[in-house]
């Protein structure tokens, strides 16, 4: 049975890079349909023609025989679908049911627990750097700092402490001491947190080493080149 036609609806400067990496690591053939952000860094309306929410990534899967299409949204669900339907050699998903459960857990953990406090910190950083006139800028920074201190910065630490512990006890990876779909999906928010100084790499040596290890994969380099060709820099 032949594999379906796979299309990635790609938005520049987005987390869709992880999907390219996943597909490349599994040696799957796919087409990239690119979209550009507007002057306000928003997704273009064309994406809403593919999915009502107009977000990226979106994965289009078309049966070669019937022509029937599926549009998949939400990164965790897309990863779960790809691993379930296309990773027949168990390259990034384990045959062991218990290990597979652990991998699937992280596919939901990323957006459900890790990403929210990081997104709050990101929004607060934008508030502080918004260029508002004094004294509004002073008050905005004070409010942003209070929110960060009361919730998001502490929750970022809580999440990073958890991930640090998981990698430390699993021989340098999230699950079972080897690369899985969970590692690929988790890479982006942890990288961005370090780059935006929401967490310090020196405080999390296991995460730092893990990032260096997984980004040395040939599939990462191949996907990075594709992203650069599309106008994104990772």
UniProtKB/Swiss-Prot annotation:
Entry annotated with the keyword Chaperone: no
Cell compartment(s), UniProt: Endoplasmic reticulum membrane
Superkingdom field: Eukaryota
Keyword Iron-sulfur: no
UniProt topology in membrane: Peripheral membrane protein
GO cellular component term of the entry, any: mitochondrion
Span of domain GST C-terminal: 96-234
Residue stretches making up the GST N-terminal domain: 3-90
Catalytic activity: RX + glutathione = an S-substituted glutathione + a halide anion + H(+)
UniProt EC number: 2.5.1.18
Family: Belongs to the GST superfamily.
Record note on quaternary structure: Homodimer.
Designated name of the protein: Glutathione S-transferase 1
């Amino acid at each position: 049975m032949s594999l379906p036609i796979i299309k990635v609806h790609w938005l520049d400067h987005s987390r869709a890079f992880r999907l390219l990496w996943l597909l490349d690591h599994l040696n799957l053939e796919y087409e990239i349909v690119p979209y550009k952000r507007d002057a306000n860094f928003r997704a273009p309306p064309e994406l809403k023609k593919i999915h009502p929410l107009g977000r990226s990534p979106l994965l289009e899967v078309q049966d070669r025989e019937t022509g029937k299409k599926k549009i998949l949204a939400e990164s965790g669900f897309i990863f779960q679908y790809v691993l379930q339907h296309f990773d027949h050699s168990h390259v990034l998903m384990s045959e062991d049911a218990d290990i597979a459960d652990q991998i699937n857990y992280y596919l939901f953990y990323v957006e459900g627990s890790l990403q929210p406090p990081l997104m709050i910190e990101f929004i607060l950083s934008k508030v502080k750097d918004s260029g508002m006139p004094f004294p509004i800028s002073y008050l905005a920074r004070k409010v942003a700092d209070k929110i960060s201190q009361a919730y998001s910065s502490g929750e970022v630490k809580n999440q990073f402490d958890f991930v640090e512990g998981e990698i430390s006890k699993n021989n340098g990876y999230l699950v079972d001491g080897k690369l899985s779909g969970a590692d690929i999906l988790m890479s982006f928010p942890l990288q961005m947190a370090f780059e935006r100084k929401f967490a310090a790499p020196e405080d999390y040596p296991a995460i730092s080493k893990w990032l260096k290890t997984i980004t040395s994969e040939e599939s990462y380099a191949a996907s990075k080149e594709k992203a650069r060709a599309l106008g994104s820099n990772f």
